[in-house]
């Protein structure tokens, strides 16, 4: 049996992070978790690029532009979309998830979805480094593993 899997060694990998400025009090914690995890796994600080955009809705376009340049092994998306009283939540969540998935499939570059989609601010805070771990850190680990896996295929 031939088993192909990625490892968690980040040395030599180039990773882009696209983060929404909206709800940045949550996004900042996600970013800190992602960057710290990338560095702990050997990604050089100079090989981490961070692009800020106004909100989560704009993330797919920024991801597309970064992916088209072909300079990164993986892209991490970070942000927080919190449900409100209107249907805006569904519009943004669907646009982000389908947009980044399309870029990933079209380019072959792994795009990790670290945009929190929660019903409350409390849930978002929990997933940004308190009770429920840090989704930014989790995405960083997955980005390293996917980049290394794809290098073997």
UniProtKB/Swiss-Prot annotation:
Keyword annotations: Riboflavin biosynthesis, Transferase
Entry-linked Gene3D superfamilies: Lumazine/riboflavin synthase
Pathways involved: Cofactor biosynthesis; riboflavin biosynthesis; riboflavin from 2-hydroxy-3-oxobutyl phosphate and 5-amino-6-(D-ribitylamino)uracil: step 1/2
InterPro entries named in the record: LS, LS/RS, LS/RS_sf
Active site: 88
UniProt-listed GO biological process terms: riboflavin biosynthetic process
Gene Ontology cellular component terms for the protein in this record: cytosol; riboflavin synthase complex
One family name in Pfam for this protein: DMRL_synthase
Function: Catalyzes the formation of 6,7-dimethyl-8-ribityllumazine by condensation of 5-amino-6-(D-ribitylamino)uracil with 3,4-dihydroxy-2-butanone 4-phosphate. This is the penultimate step in the biosynthesis of riboflavin.
HAMAP family registered for this protein in UniProt: Lumazine_synth
Stated name of the protein: 6,7-dimethyl-8-ribityllumazine synthase
Species name: Herpetosiphon aurantiacus (strain ATCC 23779 / DSM 785 / 114-95)
Encoding gene (name): ribH
